[in-house]
């Protein structure tokens, strides 16, 4: 865990006239409003944590001298997280973002002790008067890249590097697989669980193992570019995660899902400052821009790009849903009927594999 950032005051300077006007809109105040962030990985992970830190910087750029932001990186989920969150709260941060699923219970516990402080927890499901939750419908992005994978694979084997067997990750695997098999019913997904959000060594080993098992396309729900770097070395292709990772694998990355928290973070910081902040539960997708994409690699055929764009348009327009039936589970049993759609409640608790995923889902 890195504490060097905890006490460092980061002030936006030289924001320019437009940003100064943005700062003025939140009202004059003697001291800057303090916003804290707790990260599960390093800001240099080039994935999940990196994108949250981009959002933190967006707050500074938008609100200028009205805010002061701090962050703590590489915080383990559990007791350490509780200690860090409490420390931020005791140091006068008026708004604290805790950006990993495993920070949920520590966030709720500390929030009870500091009822006047606002907390925002990413990907969780527990709210209170001073705790909001927010997430992105990452599964929509998985449907887009799953379509591409199904059209581009030559071996009909896709390797999927997964972090933890929680509903968010299982949803992504299933959405990817459903979309893939719509365009290529012969394709299958092999999953390797690394039980970590960020461990470049384990992620790289998982990628090698999947390629050795015949995968010619790699995707991931982990945070480092290591799987794509292995793909680049081994002459296969894949998809980035959370951020544009093409700098690490210019040939291998076909595109990447990008988590864009900027607008949400600015909106919530502004609300905390002007007094309009209220607890809420937010789950946004492609239509809001919270789920975005890197550009296509030049190697992606035009028809594949067109198919991916149609999926995006269908999701945004409401004519297509990644979990629209018929859907069969791994055992071949129908779990969603023709033209039925899995509702959010079931999606939020998803604990089964769909047809086309190999292996057992860890308990």
PLM regions and their residue ranges:
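Bacterial N-terminal signal peptides
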Residues: 12-22
């Amino acid at each position: 865990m890195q504490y060097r950032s905890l006490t460092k005051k980061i002030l936006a300077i030289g924001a320019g006239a437009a940003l100064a006007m943005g700062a003025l809109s939140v009202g004059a105040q003697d001291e800057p409003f303090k916003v804290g962030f707790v990260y599960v990985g390093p800001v240099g992970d080039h994935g999940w944590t990196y994108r949250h830190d981009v959002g933190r910087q967006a707050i500074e750029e938008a609100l200028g001298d009205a805010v002061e932001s701090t962050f703590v990186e590489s915080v383990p989920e559990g007791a350490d997280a509780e200690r860090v969150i409490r420390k931020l709260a005791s140091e006068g941060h008026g708004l604290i973002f805790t950006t990993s699923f495993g920070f949920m219970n520590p966030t709720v516990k500390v929030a009870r002790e500091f009822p006047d402080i606002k907390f925002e927890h990413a990907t969780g499901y527990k709210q209170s008067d001073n705790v909001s939750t927010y997430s992105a419908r990452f599964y929509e992005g998985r449907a887009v890249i799953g379509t591409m994978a199904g059209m581009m694979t030559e071996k009909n084997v896709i390797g999927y590097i997964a972090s933890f067997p929680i509903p968010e990750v299982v949803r992504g695997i299933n959405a990817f697989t459903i979309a893939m098999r719509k365009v290529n019913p012969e394709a299958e997904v092999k999953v390797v669980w690394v039980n970590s959000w960020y461990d470049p060594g384990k992620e790289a080993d998982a990628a090698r193992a999947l390629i050795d098992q015949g995968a010619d396309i790699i995707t991931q729900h982990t945070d480092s570019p290591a799987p794509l770097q292995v793909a680049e070395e081994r002459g296969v292709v894949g998809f980035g995660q959370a951020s544009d990772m093409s700098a690490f694998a210019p040939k291998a990355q076909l595109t990447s899902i990008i988590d864009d928290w900027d607008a949400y973070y600015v909106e919530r910081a502004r609300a905390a400052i002007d007094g309009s902040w209220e607890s809420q539960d937010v789950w946004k997708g492609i239509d809001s821009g919270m789920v975005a994409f890197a550009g296509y690699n030049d190697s992606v055929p035009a028809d594949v790009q067109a198919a991916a764009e149609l999926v995006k348009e269908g999701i945004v327009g409401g004519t297509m849903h990644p979990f629209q039936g018929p859907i069969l589970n791994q055992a071949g049993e129908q779990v969603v009927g023709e033209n039925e759609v899995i509702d959010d409640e079931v999606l939020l608790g998803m604990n089964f594999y769909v047809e086309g995923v190999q292996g057992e889902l860890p308990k």
